[in-house]
A protein has these predicted regions:
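A preference for well-ordered globular domain cores
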Residues: 1-146
């Protein structure tokens, strides 16, 4: 394995504790990166079907909708145009934007919580066996609202 060295005296391979520790550290770091990528992939799955331009406007849409709910005189140039061009009442669009933003916030909260729980477990692993088992769980991780 990657952490064995050949011992010329005994003419056999022995575990190098230094190499084993380094291998374990590298594997943990790699799994931490894999975990971050997996979280991004799961988030991207939630956004499937939305063009990037629209995704980039989500924060602005929510900000305008919430401002209008709090003050009907608030400036809402983006939402006014979306409602006009889409042909839906402005108030209906505001409700939809707020509802979608809330749903998305909950979903992202679940993903973040799941990722952080995996990270906590990853940082606490002490053995290669624990690390391998956790790696399998991370590979199988899918979005589940709990």
């Amino acid at each position: 394995s990657e952490y064995h060295v050949f011992d010329s005296k005994s003419k056999s391979f022995k575990v190098s504790e230094d190499k084993k520790a380094e291998f374990f550290k590298r594997k943990k770091e790699s799994l931490l990166n894999t975990l971050a990528e997996k979280a991004d992939t799961i988030k991207s799955g939630l956004l499937a079907g939305y063009p990037q331009t629209e995704i980039e406007s989500f924060y602005r849409q929510e900000k305008e909708a919430l401002a209008w709910v709090n003050d009907k005189n608030s400036d809402t140039p983006m939402l006014k145009q979306v409602a006009r061009v889409r042909g839906v009442p402005f108030e209906v669009l505001v409700e939809k934007v707020i509802a979608k933003a809330s749903q998305f916030a909950v979903a992202i909260g679940v993903i973040i919580g799941q990722r952080q729980a995996f990270e906590d477990r990853l940082l606490a692993t002490k053995t290669l066996e624990e690390l391998t088992a956790l790696e399998k769980e991370i590979e199988e991780w899918t979005f589940q609202a709990n």
